[in-house]
A protein has these predicted regions:
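Aromatic-lined carbohydrate-recognition surfaces of secreted/lumenal glycan-active proteins
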Residues: 2-49, 100-118
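Extracellular/periplasmic catalytic domains that process cell-envelope and extracellular macromolecules
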Residues: 13, 55-58, 101-104, 137-138
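Short, flexible/disordered intra-domain loops and linkers
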Residues: 31-44, 72-85, 119-124, 155
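Aromatic- and acid-rich polysaccharide-binding/catalytic face
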Residues: 39, 45-81, 141, 145-151
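Alpha-helical scaffolding within the catalytic cores
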Residues: 40-54, 84-98, 127-132
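Glycoside hydrolase catalytic-domain groove-lining segments
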Residues: 58-59, 65-118
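Substrate-binding cleft of secreted/luminal carbohydrate-active enzymes
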Residues: 60-61, 67-70, 105-174
Length: 174
């Protein structure tokens, strides 16, 4: 499709560019990912990802899956327990697609956001944000921080303090 045409056209003009697509070729999924491998729903999710991965992964130099979180603890208290599972399973599935259809050297940089992604602009509880940062940086090659549009910069914002602490720890511990 059009992804392939765009990729090939860009590469003809600029072979040095590393091209990736927001979310694709992985269909972000919370409900099926938390079922874990082997479940019928999980296998259906993998099948959808296979269909898209077979087309797109060969034409992807860097992967940008999205692991935004949609469920406030106040209205979905049980779902918070699955945050690390959701991130882990989505990144594991992205790695499977890359391994099966793409290039092993292509990095994975998930999009993350410190707000609950349900249209409310409410920050994630700090413990959940720390979990998101830890799991993402432990299992991916980095991350893309999303958000902050038309917001004044706050050096002491809890989300930023968490990022700085994690990056400092990474450098100190190698």
């Amino acid at each position: 499709g059009k992804y392939v045409t765009i990729y090939q056209g860009l590469k003809q003009r600029r072979p040095d560019l590393r091209i990736g697509w927001y979310t694709d070729p992985l269909r972000r999924d919370y409900w099926r990912a938390k079922k874990l491998p082997g479940a019928t729903e999980y296998k259906a999710w993998q099948s959808e990802n296979n269909d898209l991965g077979a087309i797109m992964a060969p034409f992807t130099d860097v992967y940008f899956p999205s692991v935004y979180w949609f469920y406030p603890r106040t209205t979905h208290p049980m779902e918070a327990d699955y945050l690390s599972t959701y991130i882990h399973e989505n990144l594991s599935e992205m790695k499977r697609i890359r391994r099966t259809y793409g290039r092993a050297e292509a990095p994975i940089y998930p999009y993350v956001w410190w707000n609950i992604a349900n249209g409310s602009d409410v920050p994630m509880p700090l413990d959940m944000w720390e979990t998101m940062v830890r799991v993402t940086l432990d299992e991916a090659d980095g991350m893309v921080l999303w958000g902050g549009y038309q917001q004044p910069w706050d050096e002491n914002a809890p989300w930023w303090v968490t990022i700085k602490a994690r990056l400092t720890d990474k450098r100190r511990t190698g």
